[in-house]
Amino acid sequence: MRIKKGDLVEVISGKDKGKRGKVLRVIPKENKVIVENVNMVKRHQRPVPQLREGGIIEREAPIYASKVMVVCPACDKRTRVGYRFTEDGKKVRYCKKCGEIIDKD
């Protein structure tokens, strides 16, 4: 999976098409990601004394990774991600449109 936690992604299909958000969690076994303010669902929550109050809460639900694309921080366009090795032998992700390195490390 070429998407990592903290990446800025854009939804390319579905009811939230065009929305951008930060990846909060990656679920590789299910090939899904949870994106900030995308695919919001309402959940009924029971009250737990001393911990939280009950009611209806809104939270993000997982979305298939194939429905999102990484947004390049340099060119601000959604792009495919490639891998290359730097001079010191480190494997990094790069934008296939502009060639800039996506990983901040």
UniProtKB/Swiss-Prot annotation:
InterPro entries: KOW, Rib_uL2_dom2, Ribosomal_uL24, Ribosomal_uL24_CS, Ribosomal_uL24_KOW, Translation_prot_SH3-like_sf. GO terms for molecular function: rRNA binding; structural constituent of ribosome. One of its GO terms (cellular component) is cytosolic large ribosomal subunit. Keywords: Ribonucleoprotein, Ribosomal protein, RNA-binding, rRNA-binding. The keyword RNA-binding applies. GO terms for biological process: translation. The keyword Metal-binding does not apply. One of two assembly initiator proteins, it binds directly to the 5'-end of the 23S rRNA, where it nucleates assembly of the 50S subunit. Belongs to the universal ribosomal protein uL24 family. Part of the 50S ribosomal subunit. NCBIfam families: rplX_bact (TIGR01079). This is Large ribosomal subunit protein uL24. It comes from Thermotoga maritima (strain ATCC 43589 / DSM 3109 / JCM 10099 / NBRC 100826 / MSB8). The lineage of its organism: Bacteria, Thermotogati, Thermotogota, Thermotogae, Thermotogales. The gene is rplX.
